[in-house]
Each structure stands twice: as C-alpha cells, then as structure tokens.
C-alpha cells in the first residue's frame, strides 16, 4: 500500500489521545477480548480475481499478530479491509467492535497505520511534517516526543528529502503513533533499516504491545515475526493455510540434524531408523522426534567410535515452515489442476 491508496488525508488514520504521554494504549480502552475480527472474508477485484478467499482470524487486545505470506498471498488486500479502505465482498470485519468501512468515524480515530510506503512533502523538515499531521490528529503527542520515540530527535530540522530510506520508515512510524492508537497496523515497518535500527524498532513495538496496544504486523522478515509475534498466520493464494504460535506452526515440520562423516565412514553405516540423506560426506536427517533421533545418533557414534563433524541439531525455524508451506500449497494446486 502507498499513501495514494487512502481516501482523504492520511492524518485521519492516526489515533486519538490517551491521558499519558507514554507508549501505552489509552486507559479508556474497552474491555478485553478480540479487537480485530475477520470471519469468512472474501475480496474480489475486476475480472473475478479473488484476492481474499474466506479468511477468518481474530486478534486479542494487547496481542501482536503477524500476517505472513508469499507475494500475492492476499495480505495487503486483507489488511486494507481491516483498515477500512474497502468493504469485503463477503464475510464480516470488525475492529474495536465496529465495521471499519461503514463506521469509519468510530474506528479511525482509535487506530494508527504505518504504510509500506509513505508520501511526504519533500521540502518540509521532519518537525514540520509531524506538526502538519499532528494538526489533523486530536490530542496528538508532542512533536518532540513522537520523534524521540522513533529515534529521529536529532534529525528534527532536516528536510524530508535528505532522509535515508530507513529514516523515512521511522518518520512513517512516528506519524502512526501520533494519536496513541489502541490498534496499530504495521506494514513492513523495518524495511530499509539497518540492524541497529531494526532492533530499536522491535524494542519500541514490544513496549507498545506490553502497554496494551494491539498490533497487526505484516513483514517479509520472518525473523521479525518470529521475534515479535504472539501468534501468526501464513496466507497463500488468498487463504490462511496455518495459524498459531511460532512453536505451534513449526511443530508440524520436521527438525533437522546435520553433520559430516569422517573419511572412510560411509553413510550406509548409519542406523537405518534415522533415514539419513547423504551428499558426499554431508548428512542431513529430518525427524519429528528430535531428542530420540539425536540420542540414537550419538549412541551409534560413541559405540562405533565415529566423530561427527560440525554437528548441528535444531527444530524447524519459521522460515523453513514458511517455505515448506508455500511449496506444499503450490504442489497441491498443481495436482488439483
């Protein structure tokens, strides 16, 4: 999404104030429960293309939920429905108990949106840009506070056109946080940031969540989702193919054990039950019983007096689960065709 996708000015999409000046959600937030809900949601475009095909999920108050997927999976189309930029063709969407499209005035003042690609007047300074948006935001944070939150205080007098790509992303985040949102939508929040900037942003997002802000994150950085998300969902071709905690999503995928055998020790000597795949002396074992398989391997190595070189054993990562899901879904579609 870009700033051009938004009906009206962008400042309408920031949130209303809280009493405090911290990064926490407003004290006036409603009672606990799901604050983002999608049920059987479908979205079609001209020509009949269905970008969102029956998506259902919910996000609890104070939860950080990551929506992941391959390019064209339907993430942006789904998030646009949640942000109230369009109405679903079928199904229901609720944010803070309201239809975000038909009840915009009840929703928009309470949410913040960090776009994937913001649009700023390039000749304004950073401070002038924040003040301009703050002028359209009820009870906005002080400009200096917003800039310090995202690490741009020292760049306050710099013109926007002189900012790096990463600094522009920080400015996007500052604008999204101006109104102390109850619900925060983050679309690729750390694109263009260096490693330090990414970690700083992660820490800020954690503070927001810990303060009660509900966060919906879309990102291509799987490490980011793995680090931040309380729960996540992976989309493919308009559908959610798996959802849960990172541990739940990866648990269904095999762990792996990798090592090298010394010269003169063939892979055929390995215990048959390990089902090892060999490429020269390099061995990979994929297993759903990591502890048992590792114990069996180490017992064999000790009894056979074989040294396992570069031994590495680990559970499936989110990246491996993501790639496995995408590949499996694509293969299923080919078979169905």
Positions of predicted regions on the chain:
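An acidic, carboxylate-rich microenvironment
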Residues: 90, 106, 128, 248, ...
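Short, charged/small-residue-rich alpha-helical element at the C-terminal edge
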Residues: 255-329, 337
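ABC-family P-loop ATPase nucleotide-binding domain
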Residues: 1-43, 328-337
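N-terminal compositionally biased, intrinsically disordered segments and leader/signal-like regions
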Residues: 3, 15-17, 32, 71, ...
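ABC transporter nucleotide-binding domains
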Residues: 33-38, 43-236, 242
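A generic structural signal for secondary-structure junctions
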Residues: 112, 134, 138, 251-254, ...
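ABC transporter nucleotide-binding domain
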Residues: 201-288
């Amino acid at each position: 999404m870009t700033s051009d996708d938004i009906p009206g000015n962008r400042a309408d999409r920031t949130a209303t104030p809280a009493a405090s000046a911290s990064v926490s959600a407003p004290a006036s937030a409603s009672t606990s429960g799901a604050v983002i809900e999608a049920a059987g949601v479908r979205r079609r475009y001209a020509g009949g293309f269905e970008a969102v095909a029956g998506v259902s999920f919910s996000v609890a108050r104070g939860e950080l939920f990551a929506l992941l997927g391959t390019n064209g999976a339907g993430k942006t189309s789904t998030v646009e429905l949640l942000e109230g930029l369009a109405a679903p063709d079928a199904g229901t969407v609720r944010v803070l108990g309201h239809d975000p499209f038909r009840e915009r005035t009840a929703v928009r003042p309470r949410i913040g949106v960090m776009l994937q690609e913001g649009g700023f007047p390039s000749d304004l300074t950073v401070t002038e840009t924040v003040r301009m948006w703050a002028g359209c935001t009820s009870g906005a944070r002080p400009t200096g506070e917003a800039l310090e939150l995202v690490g741009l205080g020292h760049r306050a007098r710099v013109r926007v056109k002189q900012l790096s790509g990463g600094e522009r992303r920080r400015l996007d985040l500052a604008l999204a946080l101006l109104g102390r949102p109850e619900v925060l939508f983050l679309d690729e929040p750390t694109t263009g940031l260096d490693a330090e900037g990414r970690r700083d942003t992660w820490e800020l997002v954690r503070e927001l969540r810990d303060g009660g802000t509900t966060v919906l994150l879309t990102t291509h950085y799987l490490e980011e989702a793995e680090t931040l998300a309380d729960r996540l969902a992976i989309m493919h071709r308009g559908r959610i193919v798996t959802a849960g905690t990172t541990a739940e999503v990866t648990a269904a995928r095999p762990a792996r054990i990798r090592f090298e055998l010394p010269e003169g020790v063939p892979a055929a000597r390995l215990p048959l039950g390990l089902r090892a795949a060999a490429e020269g002396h390099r061995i990979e074992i994929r297993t759903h019983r990591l502890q048992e398989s590792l114990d069996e391997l180490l017992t064999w190595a000790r009894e056979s007096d074989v040294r396992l070189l570069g031994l590495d054993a680990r559970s499936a990562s989110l990246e491996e689960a993501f790639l496995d899901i995408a590949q499996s879904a694509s293969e299923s579609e080919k078979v169905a065709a």
